[in-house]
């Protein structure tokens, strides 16, 4: 159903967000320039919609995408439940669920979800920041009706 597909795509976005948090923090710790790191990811096979949007507000420092950890936790929890109900033995999903559960306990339910990066920054005493990135992502594309998912045959 459409709601199951939405939960699945939100799960994928969350996995990308956590991977980006780890990658950006590792590059910062290695002394790489964050603007160069952003561009290197953007032009590579490691790019994603999540990188092009959420990495910018991470590197700005605002981390404001108007989506909070409690909402992420709800979606990834629903995905994990869907897998369990269908006897799919996942490994990454339970880890992501645990990471966000711990982050919510540490930072609060209403903390912006990109602040998952704090789990990596704080133990190292780092701030993963670049220059010239926007403090919010603005969707200025005109409203459209939704799309029907039509499988390729």
Model regions and ranges:
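NAD(P)-dependent dehydrogenase/reductase Rossmann-like domain
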Residues: 101, 105-153
């Amino acid at each position: 159903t459409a709601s199951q597909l939405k939960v699945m795509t939100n799960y994928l976005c969350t996995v990308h967000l956590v991977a980006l948090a780890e990658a950006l923090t590792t590059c910062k710790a290695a002394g790489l320039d964050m603007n160069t790191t952003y561009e290197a990811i953007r032009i590579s096979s490691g790019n994603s919609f999540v990188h092009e949007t959420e990495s910018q507000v991470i590197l700005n420092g605002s981390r404001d995408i108007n989506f909070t950890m409690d909402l992420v936790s709800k979606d990834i929890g629903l995905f994990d439940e869907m897998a369990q109900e269908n006897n799919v033995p996942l490994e990454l999903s339970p880890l992501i669920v645990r990471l966000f559960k711990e982050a919510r306990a540490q930072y609060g339910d209403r903390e912006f979800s990109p602040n998952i990066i704090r789990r990596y920054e704080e133990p190292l005493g780092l701030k993963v920041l670049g220059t010239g990135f926007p403090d919010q992502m603005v969707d200025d594309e005109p409203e459209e009706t939704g799309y029907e998912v039509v499988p390729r045959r």
